[in-house]
């Protein structure tokens, strides 16, 4: 995806907190980051190269796609960022993020008189853990506040204590060590604290607000200010952490929303209570298929390809045959699998967050589709076409000084790339003649369609070639020879002029014209695809011409050498012993390699 296309997509990114993922052409995650405002933060990566940090500039050279997950708060985004970095281990996050774990609030509920304190890890299965939290300093202050509000003990042990500590005199401890509070009363305080940490903090906030108002009326301004600060801290701590669930659940969340032409399915993978991955799927919806049937199809398809099946799968809609699907899932793993729609609690809240992300994606796609349909309609008017084109194809040629000449064919349907329809061509005739190469490519493409080759069907509604008048006339001759009446145009890169067959005067559209921008996207994608294939061909030729000529070095040995040394140049620099140590090699074969490169030099 070109830089301009990414910038266009960036305009649709919401102004909300969340996490973004930059990816390369293969879909590998290169970088995970968080933002208080997603669009603003992501936009900073697309500024002028000279203004970028060298590391950022190096990363962006590989970025060809991005994804994002919207969260309810920046705190959630921080935690999700941490989880995703640990999960994906992106190349460009290694030096930019540490691998520390965020702290938790631990309540030792198994103790007779539980205490609450900060913990870095979940070390036992009996205590209650809340968090994690990202601001350690604020968390320590809040812990002091909680101990003051609820009066729980802060001492490590009560065994050696014979009299109350200073906290009791300051009103910050209920002093269970001195017997001033019963186990039952203390337990009620612990439960109140747990209820607060679970998110039900409005009641205590209301009580504090009443106290603050009374203090203000009594002119106790210092007390009122202290209560105001406590309320702010309580609200900050009370912000629910939906990105990490309270228990170490192993589950998937699957949410489905219906668009006009297809269903969008979003999958969040939760492992050890953390969201560690996101998958997005678009399902073309058959006529009269309801959401339950669509969900059944997706579950079967997704988990047939994915062996990582957790014991619990939470859904926005149950499959039409949920019990049958559960039995099928169980047959694929060694444990029971439950499918259900959560009705309340934190699981319901996380599913709602997933569906909010799905809604944003669906709305973005619908806006983009409407925009592209408008661009196609406009293009039909300015190019004087009889019908609005749906399938657009663009052809481009790439070579280096006439070496390894190749051509590309890219396809846009409805204004969007149809990558499964992309094709490469190795030029068979004139290697150093772009015009002749374009004519050959279009001829071969159309001949394949005429022979009913399914890989080249249907025929295009419009053909675009990279070039000017010479290129468009050469391809027009092919269409005339084949008796085909397909609208044909060329787009010249220098001045972005549109050429038509037999007309020397180009059509010039405004730079912001949405029809021109669509043709530019199509042309740039064909250019990228052609260059990529040419580079692969030249790299393959370099590797094969060197190693395939060495006696005793077959396909497997060549592969082992390239895997071990990563390049032919490094093989040439290696010693006899280093080459002989490669799996599958021996001293005789290593000597043949050494002698071959020695004779070459």
From Swiss-Prot:
One GO cellular component from the entry? Answer: excinuclease repair complex
Q: Which GO terms describe its molecular function?
A: DNA binding; excinuclease ABC activity
The signal sequence is: none
Please report the stretch or stretches of sequence annotated as the GIY-YIG domain: 15-94
Q: Which UniProt keywords apply?
A: Cytoplasm, DNA damage, DNA excision, DNA repair, Excision nuclease, SOS response
Tell me the Gene Ontology biological-process terms attached to this UniProt entry.
nucleotide-excision repair; SOS response
Q: Name one Pfam family in it.
A: UVR
Domain of life, per lineage: Bacteria
Can you say where in the cell this protein is located? Cytoplasm
Supply the InterPro entries for this chain.
Answer: GIY-YIG_endonuc, GIY-YIG_endonuc_sf, GIY-YIG_UvrC_Cho, Hlx-hairpin-Hlx_DNA-bd_motif, RuvA_2-like, UVR_dom, UVR_dom_sf, UvrABC_protein_C
Q: Which stretches make up the UVR domain? A: 202-237
SMART domains assigned to the protein according to its UniProt record, in alphabetical order: GIYc, HhH1
Show the Gene3D superfamilies listed in the entry. Answer: 5' to 3' exonuclease, C-terminal subdomain (1.10.150.20), GIY-YIG endonuclease (3.40.1440.10), UVR domain (4.10.860.10), UvrC, RNAse H endonuclease domain (3.30.420.340)
Family assignment from sequence similarity: Belongs to the UvrC family.
Tell me, what does this protein do in biology? Answer: The UvrABC repair system catalyzes the recognition and processing of DNA lesions. UvrC both incises the 5' and 3' sides of the lesion. The N-terminal half is responsible for the 3' incision and the C-terminal half is responsible for the 5' incision.
Subunit relationships = Interacts with UvrB in an incision complex.
Under what name is this protein listed?
A: UvrABC system protein C
Q: What is the lineage of its organism?
A: Bacteria, Bacillati, Bacillota, Clostridia, Eubacteriales
* Gene name linked to the record: uvrC
């Amino acid at each position: 995806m070109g830089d301009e296309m990414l910038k266009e997509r960036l305009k649709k990114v919401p102004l909300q907190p969340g996490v973004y993922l930059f990816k390369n052409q293969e879909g590998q995650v290169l970088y995970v980051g968080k933002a208080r405002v997603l669009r603003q933060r992501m936009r900073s990566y697309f500024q002028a190269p000279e203004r970028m940090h060298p590391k950022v500039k190096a990363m962006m050279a590989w970025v060809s796609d991005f994804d994002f997950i919207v969260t309810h708060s920046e705190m959630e985004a921080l935690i999700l960022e941490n989880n995703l970095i640990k999960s994906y281990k992106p190349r460009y996050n290694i030096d930019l993020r540490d691998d520390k774990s965020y702290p938790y609030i631990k309540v030792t509920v198994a103790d007779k008189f539980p205490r609450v304190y900060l913990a870095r890890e979940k070390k036992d299965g009996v205590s209650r853990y809340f968090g994690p939290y990202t601001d350690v300093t604020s968390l320590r202050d809040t812990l002091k506040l909680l101990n003051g509000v609820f009066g729980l003990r802060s001492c490590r042990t009560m065994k050696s204590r014979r009299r109350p500590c200073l906290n009791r005199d300051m009103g910050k401890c209920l002093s269970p060590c001195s017997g001033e509070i019963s186990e039952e009363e203390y337990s009620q305080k612990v439960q109140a604290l747990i209820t607060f940490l679970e998110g039900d903090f409005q009641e205590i906030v209301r009580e504090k607000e009443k106290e603050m108002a009374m203090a203000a009326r009594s002119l106790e301004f210092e007390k009122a200010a202290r209560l105001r600060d406590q309320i702010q801290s309580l609200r900050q701590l009370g912000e629910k952490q939906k990105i990490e669930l309270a228990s170490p659940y192993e589950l998937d969340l699957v949410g489905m929303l219906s668009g006009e032409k297809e269903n969008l399915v979003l999958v969040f993978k939760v492992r050890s209570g953390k969201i560690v991955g996101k998958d997005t799927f678009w399902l073309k919806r058959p006529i009269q298929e309801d959401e339950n049937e669509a969900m059944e199809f997706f579950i079967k398809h997704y988990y047939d390809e994915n062996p990582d099946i957790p014991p619990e799968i939470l859904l926005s809609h149950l499959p039409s045959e949920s019990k049958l699907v559960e039995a099928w899932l169980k047959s694929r793993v060694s444990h029971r699998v439950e499918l259900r729609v959560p009705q309340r609690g934190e699981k319901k809240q996380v599913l709602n967050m997933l569906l909010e992300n799905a809604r944003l994606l669906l709305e973005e796609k619908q806006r983009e589709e409407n925009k592209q349909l408008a661009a196609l309609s406009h293009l039909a008017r300015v190019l004087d076409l009889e019908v609005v084109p749906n399938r657009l194809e663009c052809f481009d040629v790439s070579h280096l000084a006439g070496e390894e000449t190749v051509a590309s064919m890219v396809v846009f349907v409805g204004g969007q790339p149809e990558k499964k329809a992309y094709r490469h061509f190795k030029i068979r005739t004139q290697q150093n003649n772009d015009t002749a190469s374009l004519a050959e490519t279009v001829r071969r493409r159309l001949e394949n369609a005429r022979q009913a080759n399914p890989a080249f069907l249907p025929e295009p509604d419009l053909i675009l070639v990279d070039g000017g008048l010479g290129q468009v006339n050469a391809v027009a001759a092919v269409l005339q020879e084949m008796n085909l009446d397909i609208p044909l145009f060329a787009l010249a890169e220098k001045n972005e002029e549109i050429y038509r067959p037999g007309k020397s005067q180009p059509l010039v559209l405004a730079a912001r014209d949405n029809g021109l921008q669509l043709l530019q996207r199509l042309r740039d994608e064909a250019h990228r695809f052609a260059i990529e294939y040419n580079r692969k061909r030249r790299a393959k030729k370099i590797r094969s011409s060197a190693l395939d000529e060495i006696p005793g070095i077959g396909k497997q040995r060549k592969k082992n050498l390239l895997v071990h040394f990563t390049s032919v140049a490094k093989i040439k620099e290696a010693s006899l012993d280093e080459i002989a140590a490669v799996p599958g090699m021996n001293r005789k074969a290593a000597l043949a390699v050494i002698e071959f490169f020695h004779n070459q030099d």
